[in-house]
Amino acid sequence: MLKIGIVGGTGYTGGELLRLLSIHPLAEVTVVTSRKQAGQPVDTVHPNLKSLTDLKFEDPDPAKIAERCDVVFTAVPHGAAMAVVPELLKYGLRVIDLSADYRLPTEKFEQVYNKKHLDPREAVYGLPELHPEVKDATLIANPGCYPTGANLACAPLIAQGLVNRAVVDSKSGISGSGQDPTEGTHYPNVTQNVRPYNLTTHRHKAEIEQEMLRLNNSTRIHFTPHVIPSTRGIMTTAHLFVDEPLTTDQVQTIYDEFYKNKPFVRLQKPSLANVRGSNFCDIAFEVEKDSDRIVVVSAIDNMVKGASGQAIQNMNLMYGFDERTGLWTSGLSP
């Protein structure tokens, strides 16, 4: 049985890791940490886990974690992981980091997040549909939620060198903003409303550009996010402008081939309800007649495929498990 530690278990992503791993047949959580909640039962913070775990939060001590774990998920705020990851790696642990600390090159990270990086090192970007090398990784940088939906929508056509410009519009549920309440997540400001924000400057744009330019360095990327009155889910609409007209059959073939043997990508009409609670990404497209535009839409659960589920998918691949293990479940439709 694979032994797992979770550093930072009180937030949404930590709670989702605990929920999903509670039914994983080949892994068990042996350590979950929180400085503020040390000594408290996990279910006092995550009451949905009552009767599913007897764990208590502990202070984060890398040496003690290493004695009881094989792999560690770090689910801490941006800027905090870089302080703990080096210690975990020093003890021979494999690490899957759910923060942004290792997703970008050091200089780009410092520019985008306005923080000095304390631990410049390379990690494998953990989008397994694009990075099969996750299976051999010691440190995985789990992708952001917006980039997951955007990159999976855009990658097949961009990888073919067919797209000169991509205009990406994403709409996310409120949980993507994290657990701490803000003016932007306050119920009266969210309900019956759609709130665009960081129209041209959202920090996840850097991840989308990084991955798509790796596939084709001449594609221009534009990205704008919105918050919608939903707890979970991201619906992404990508307007892809191509150099030469393509038929529907041609595009279908490209997507079929690209995602062949990628079990968590389903080519069907996207719906947030159909992916909620699951690790699936549903994708569909439409070719605009007499135009250079192809519209691709993707749907994911931002807490699962956009965060904790994808992290477990990466873990499965790292340890030679079927990537579906513990994750092969439908969305909660309706």
Curated annotation (Swiss-Prot):
Active-site residue numbers: C145
Keywords: Amino-acid biosynthesis, Arginine biosynthesis, Cytoplasm, NADP, Oxidoreductase
Gene Ontology molecular functions: N-acetyl-gamma-glutamyl-phosphate reductase activity; NAD binding; NADP+ binding
GO biological process terms on file: L-arginine biosynthetic process
Record region (Disordered): 173-192
UniProt cross-references to Gene3D superfamilies, sorted A to Z: Dihydrodipicolinate Reductase, domain 2, NAD(P)-binding Rossmann-like Domain
Pathway(s) of this molecule: Amino-acid biosynthesis; L-arginine biosynthesis; N(2)-acetyl-L-ornithine from L-glutamate: step 3/4
Functional description taken from the UniProt entry: Catalyzes the NADPH-dependent reduction of N-acetyl-5-glutamyl phosphate to yield N-acetyl-L-glutamate 5-semialdehyde.
Protein name according to UniProt: N-acetyl-gamma-glutamyl-phosphate reductase
Gene that this sequence comes from: argC
